[in-house]
Swiss-Prot record:
Name recorded for this polypeptide: Caricain
Origin species: Carica papaya (Papaya)
Family annotation (Gene3D superfamilies): Cysteine proteinases
Role description: Cysteine proteinase with a high level of diversity in substrate specificity.
Propeptide: 17-132
Length: 348
């Protein structure tokens, strides 16, 4: 895609008015645009307006809209150039397409306390044989995964990751899938810092000690408040303890995932991760982990192995809120640091 020059505010407003009547909730392709959309400024503005409608985006004034359009256009150029390469994944115009990578990182990334902290938990999955593992695991198909949620601009990924694992093990042990409260962890888990970051095993320790309420009783607010756990009525879900997967090994993590959903961490700050739309993601990314997610399965597609990850950025990101990250065989930190820090709840 050839870069289209920036336009003046007056021209931008004029074109916006011209195309306004024709904009509707279009049926976007899987990546959110077609090559025809790249042929003129008018088509780009129409695409931008359609994208705004699809993602319920509103801007305070024309200056802000023009600023976001320029970022959108730059991201679209990056998406198109990336998708022309022979990758196993593709990018698209998701919810974050009007954010620069710096803005995206400030709002959604870096919400982990140092994930290299070593904890003295049970290490049940150490150097176990992978020969007898099932070829594919998907805990969604077994009814152990609740719908994808959105953490908003609160740095609470650690709470979402932990809660998803507790929901999973509770379903496996009791046969009941219930949605649990991330907000309780944001408000009440004292070693973490609410919307300013946390650490999944601390959250899992909290649940083992105190239990956790239903999401309907303690709903998510995307901001830290006063702990209300003692005032909230209704049932709670409790676990028995916390387990740790020995890090930096594919087999250990696969063994753990085969038994239950697992909290994992990744480096998510890169532009490809921000704009990921589908396929098996293989980078580029580093291993300085900054975001907690949940491994809910694994498998192979087109001969490539992957770990199935549930994220907390809503269903408009990735594969309806999920990402498949390429497996790295043997001993390594894994793609995007996926094997570096993995924990799970235990429940008798």
């Amino acid at each position: 895609m050839a870069m289209i020059p920036s336009i003046s505010k007056l021209l931008f407003v004029a074109i916006c008015l011209f195309v306004h009547m024709s904009v509707s909730f279009g049926d976007f392709s899987i990546v959110g645009y077609s090559q025809d959309d790249l042929t003129s400024t008018e088509r780009l503005i129409q695409l931008f307006n359609s994208w705004m409608l699809n993602h319920n985006k509103f801007y305070e004034n024309v200056d802000e809209k023009l600023y976001r359009f320029e970022i959108f256009k730059d991201n679209l150029n990056y998406i198109d150039e990336t998708n022309k390469k022979n990758n196993s994944y593709w990018l698209g115009l998701n919810e974050f397409a009007d954010l620069s990578n710096d803005e995206f990182n400030e709002k959604y990334v870096g919400s982990l306390i140092d994930a290299t902290i070593e904890q003295s938990y049970d290490e049940e999955f150490i150097n176990e044989d992978t020969v007898n593992l099932p070829e594919n695991v998907d805990w969604r198909k077994k009814g152990a995964v609740t719908p994808v949620r959105h953490q908003g601009s609160c740095g609470s990924c650690w709470a979402f990751s932990a809660v998803a694992t507790v929901e999973g093990i509770n379903k496996i042990r009791t046969g009941k899938l219930v949605e649990l409260s991330e907000q309780e962890l944001v408000d009440c888990e004292r070693r973490s810092h609410g919307c300013k970051g946390g650490y999944p095993p601390y959250a899992l320790e909290y649940v083992a000690k105190n239990g956790i309420h239903l999401r309907s009783k303690y709903p998510y607010k995307a901001k830290q408040g006063t702990c209300r756990a003692k005032q909230v009525g209704g049932p709670i879900v409790k676990t028995s303890g916390v387990g740790r997967v020995q890090p930096n090994n594919e087999g250990n993590l696969l063994n753990a995932i085969a038994k239950q959903p697992v909290s994992v961490v990744v480096e998510s700050k890169g532009r490809p991760f921000q704009l990921y739309k589908g396929g098996i993601f293989e980078g580029p990314c580093g291993t300085k982990v900054d975001h907690a997610v949940t491994a809910v399965g694994y498998g192979k597609s087109g001969g490539k192995g992957y770990i199935l990850i549930k994220n907390s950025w809503g269903t408009a990101w990735g594969e309806k809120g999920y990402i498949r990250i390429k497996r790295a065989p043997g001993n390594s930190p894994g793609v995007c640091g996926l094997y570096k820090s993995s924990y799970y709840p235990t429940k008798n």
